[in-house]
Amino acid sequence: MSLMVIIMACVGFFLLQGAWPQEGVHRKPSFLALPGHLVKSEETVILQCWSDVMFEHFLLHREGKFNNTLHLIGEHHDGVSKANFSIGPMMPVLAGTYRCYGSVPHSPYQLSAPSDPLDMVIIGLYEKPSLSAQPGPTVQAGENVTLSCSSRSSYDMYHLSREGEAHERRLPAVRSINGTFQADFPLGPATHGGTYRCFGSFRDAPYEWSNSSDPLLVSVTGNPSNSWPSPTEPSSKTGNPRHLHVLIGTSVVKIPFTILLFFLLHRWCSDKKNAAVMDQEPAGNRTVNSEDSDEQDHQEVSYA
């Protein structure tokens, strides 16, 4: 492989690295759904990505759909940059987990860290379940309360929402002795009331939910505090995202290629310089006449 081929390969590597998006250069933007992430069929929802970093562009990405990335130019107002992505009319193919990213001017391939995930759910596709409270919807402060969501439809999962809370609790459905599919949500000792609803979903379509149950108002008498324990996990996972920040990795890969490219260029320049010096030497200095050659051969024979 010639020197120029190696150099061109190194240059090509750097060009490819420059064209590949790099995540994690800036901190993550905020991400929310307006009016909310539970959307009825055929309705439209706005996904808003915003940050106090002056991003020039925002990207919207749906998990598992690499060809469905949307780009918008950011709007700048009062020290905040934002973009509003209109999603709709809502249908099952649009449901899923979304994230957004930001990029600054002159660096379109250097993306921010991903926002927290946002689950967009389409509701109203199946019949509504029933929601009840045990021992009842009105309880004394400190009394244990359980909310039961049930239906004759063979739902695999139930989701319990409370007005004012961003995330739902979820539990798998269990078939009861009376033939219904049920999930019991233990709320623990009652400290604060609220309005609850539940939804059902199937295992093979986790973002497609039933109609909402009728709202259930739970009232607490006595001396309630400001919150109710949340013994079950929320349906949205807001931990560390699965996206790997590749900026460090690509930098580590670039270092040896930079050294190699410098070495090859230095060697190539040295070879060119030596060749130029050789071309400038007098012809007499580079030739040996026949007499000198014969004399050297004779001396070599004499010393042998």
UniProtKB/Swiss-Prot annotation:
Q: Which InterPro entries match?
A: Ig-like_dom_sf (IPR036179), Ig-like_fold (IPR013783), Ig-like_Receptors_ImmuneReg (IPR050412), Ig_sub (IPR003599), Immunoglobulin_dom (IPR013151)
Residue ranges annotated as coiled coil are none
Keyword Signal applies = yes
Keyword Repeat recorded? yes
Gene3D superfamilies with a match to the protein in the record? Immunoglobulins
Homology family: Belongs to the immunoglobulin superfamily.
Q: Specify the protein name.
A: Killer cell immunoglobulin-like receptor 2DS4
Q: Which organism is it from?
A: Homo sapiens (Human)
Which lineage ranks, top first, belong to the organism behind this chain? Eukaryota, Metazoa, Chordata, Craniata, Vertebrata
Q: Which gene encodes it?
A: KIR2DS4
